[in-house]
A protein has these predicted regions:
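N-terminal activation segment of mature serine protease catalytic domains
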Residues: 23-72, 76, 84, 92, ...
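C-terminal recognition in membrane/secretory proteostasis and scaffolding
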Residues: 24, 85, 239-472
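Conserved active-site neighborhood of the chymotrypsin/trypsin-like protease fold
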Residues: 26-29, 57, 75-153, 157-160, ...
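Flexible, gly/ser-rich surface segments that form the specificity/activation loops bordering the active-site cleft
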Residues: 37, 64, 132-177, 211-218, ...
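Active-site-proximal beta-strands of protease catalytic cores
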Residues: 48-51, 81-84, 142-155, 181, ...
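Short conserved beta-strand and strand-loop elements enriched in small hydrophobics
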Residues: 52, 93-101, 149-154, 307-315, ...
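C-terminal subregion of chymotrypsin/trypsin-like serine protease catalytic domains
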Residues: 197, 201-242, 424, 441, ...
Length: 472
């Protein structure tokens, strides 16, 4: 059972706005008069909310540039700060945080999960202000629709600002669950806490809003009860990354709850599940009362589980238990890509690769504007078919080859494939002649040198070409 991550603080809240470097002592809201709690929860949030800024130079499915958002301290002793994955990015060139009234300090990317839009940053605990405290997280219960909440952050650079609203609903969109709120969430709020104004607990992480041009009062936050599961696993040094799901499910758009009907079983994944087309996946065998409402529930239920896991299924009208392999996908922070001439290339393994990318071709993640690669006509999300007639399935090998061409100042011929309809085909091919420049491996944990073939293997794919060591 989930438990609340609690924190105790004492003394009186005190601000000194005469000096930019104010000091403050934080008070636990539970010692305040009931009538004042709601209005003082925002003041209390100053003690754990931070600014986050990041710079992305080599994007992995992100966007190049400088960005800012919010975050909040979840474990002072470990120096852990929670924010959105889209705030931290998958491969930040630089990452910094600042507590209120303090200068920015360096942070590192400890864990990132794009399915949940969650990132855990790490700072040196010694650099956290003495008055900084860990937020109290609502890990046990789902928020009640209609309950009062406040979104805190830095909207449009208006630092440490709060907005009020209610929990409007609970939604499942884009493969994950969301808390819906009418508390305004604007640019700069992302990654900040969504606070219960009844308890002072953080119930969610501000994440997204619908376009202001077409809607009003539609904001979304990552549920804290889901984020807490990942945090607990990380505290126990267990990888909480999503497991491989070698199944695609049929989607019924008219159903309010999507039963997990097996549409196809993939055979070339690192795990094999003994399911059949037409099976219905119901729940974990050891928790049959909690039935899955969508694929996100299944993914979340498998986090932290290893080896054999029992699934309750329905087959031909009868319920039975089958045992499936549970194995986490490689951590995003271990992913390594290649930069050449403004292009970022890497592996993008998908569960339906055996249908759409059976040869395991590398993928172009990003092409910088006005770069050599852009001028040559290379585009994002093209597949790399060959370089000078050679096929590369490993960015380390490709890096070594392009390094040699760069040293000789020779041009190379790249052939790429894009999934775009052409006469009697769903793919088109492009030929790109360009000179390699600034060839290097990139990623949070990328090696300095390439072409050595010394990257550790990260799990084999039966029936598929093995990619480089730590590529994701």
């Amino acid at each position: 059972m989930r438990t609340k991550i609690s924190v105790l603080a004492a003394a009186v809240l005190m601000f000194s706005f005469a000096s930019p470097a104010f000091s403050e002592t934080c008070i636990a809201p539970e010692v305040m008069a009931d009538g004042r709690k709601a209005e003082l929860y925002f003041a209390f949030a100053n003690c754990y909310t931070v600014k986050v800024r990041t710079r992305v130079k080599y994007p992995f499915e992100d966007a190049r540039g400088s960005y800012s958002g919010a975050g909040f301290l979840i474990d002072r002793s470990l120096g852990w700060i929670a924010t959105n994955a889209h705030v931290s990015s998958r491969n930040p060139e630089s990452l910094e945080v600042a507590f209120k009234g303090k200068k920015f300090i360096d942070a590192s990317l400890h864990y990132v999960d794009y399915l949940l839009d969650l990132a855990i940053l790490k700072v040196s605990p010694e650099k956290i202000p003495k008055w900084g405290i860990s937020a109290t997280l609502a890990c046990s219960d789902e928020p009640v629709v209609g309950s009062a909440v406040g979104a805190y952050g830095h909207p449009y650079s208006l630092s440490y600002s709060g907005t009020r609203g209610i929990v409007s609903g609970k939604r499942y969109r884009h493969g994950r669950r969301w808390i819906q709120t009418d508390a305004p969430i604007n640019k700069g709020n992302s990654g900040g806490p969504l606070i219960s104004l009844n308890t002072g607990e953080v119930i969610g992480i501000n994440s997204a809003t619908y376009s202001k041009k077409t809607s009003e009062g539609l904001g979304f936050a990552v549920p804290m009860y889901h984020a807490c599961t990942l945090i607990r696993l990380l505290e126990r040094e267990i990888d909480p990354s999503p497991s491989y799901i070698p199944i695609s499910f049929a989607f019924d758009r008219d159903a309010s709850v999507s039963d997990l009907y097996v549409a196809i079983v993939y055979r070339k994944q690192p795990v094999h599940w003994p399911l059949k087309v037409g099976d219905r996946v119901i729940a974990l065998a050891d928790d049959p009362e909690v039935e899955f409402e969508n694929q996100g529930d299944l993914v979340h239920a498998l986090r932290g589980k290893r080896n054999k896991v029992g699934l309750l299924i329905e087959r031909s009208g009868k319920r039975e238990t089958v045992f499936v392999d549970s194995k986490p996908r490689p951590k995003l922070i271990t992913r390594v890509g290649l930069h050449v001439s403004g292009i970022v290339i890497g592996r993008q393994p998908l569960k339906d690769d055996e249908l759409l990318n059976p040869d395991g071709l590398l993928t172009v993640y990003d092409v910088a504007s006005a770069s050599i690669g852009s001028q040559a006509g290379v585009a994002s999300y093209n597949h790399l078919v060959s370089v000078d007639g050679r096929s590369f399935k490993d960015v380390d090998d490709l890096c070594g080859y392009l390094k040699k061409a760069e040293a000789k100042k020779e041009k190379v011929k790249m052939v790429t494939r894009i999934d775009k309809y052409e006469y009697r085909a769903q793919s088109k091919y492009g030929l790109h002649l360009m000179k390699p420049k600034n060839v290097k491996l990139v990623g949070p944990e990328a090696p300095e040198n390439c072409g050595n073939g010394n990257m550790e293997a990260d799990g084999e794919k039966e029936g598929a070409v093995i990619s480089s060591a730590r590529l994701w």
